[in-house]
């Protein structure tokens, strides 16, 4: 989506996000019911590092909500994409889908564009269906913002810590 369609879409999702009567739930479990170590600490660190750059303090629910809402307008990017997958496809197809998403991101980068994959959209599948044709046979997986990066934005300075290679790969001779 671009232009006016993107603006209408964003307004609709923001309205749904701020409607206490709206049913904003994902059709699938994106995250575990309860995070566990080491993933819990890693996720928190990235979150607090980002919020630190944005000047959002712990417990500042108003700024936290405002930042979350920026997801729904694709962080003001000029292009917003929604990705779906057939609901009967299993984990192997989801792995393929992840590789497809990565290829979209690599292709965009090769053209000087930046992307931001966004899980937040899965919770708004009902509202999304009001704006774009997503058949009942499909699940909304995620969204993705695309455009030229605004390097003056503090969030674009975030470089998350990475685990050392030896923590997640084994070389066998």
Kindly label every feature range from the protein language model.
Residues 1-173:
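Acidic, surface-exposed loops and disordered segments
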């Amino acid at each position: 989506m671009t232009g006016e369609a993107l603006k209408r879409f964003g307004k609709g999702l923001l309205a749904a996000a701020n409607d206490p009567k709206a049913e904003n739930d994902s059709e699938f479990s994106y995250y575990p019911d309860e995070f566990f170590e080491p993933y819990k600490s890693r996720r928190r660190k990235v979150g607090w590092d980002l919020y630190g750059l944005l000047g959002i303090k712990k417990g500042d629910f108003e700024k936290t909500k405002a930042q979350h809402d920026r997801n729904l307008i694709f962080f003001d990017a000029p292009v917003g994409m929604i990705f779906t997958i057939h609901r009967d496809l299993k984990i192997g197809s989801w792995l393929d889908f992840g590789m497809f998403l990565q290829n979209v991101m690599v292709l965009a980068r090769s053209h000087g564009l930046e992307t931001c994959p966004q899980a937040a959209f899965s919770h708004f599948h009902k509202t999304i269906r009001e704006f774009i044709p997503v058949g009942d046979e499909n699940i909304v997986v995620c969204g993705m913002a695309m455009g030229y990066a605004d390097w003056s934005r503090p969030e674009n300075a975030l470089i998350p810590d990475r685990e050392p290679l030896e923590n997640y790969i084994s070389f066998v001779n």
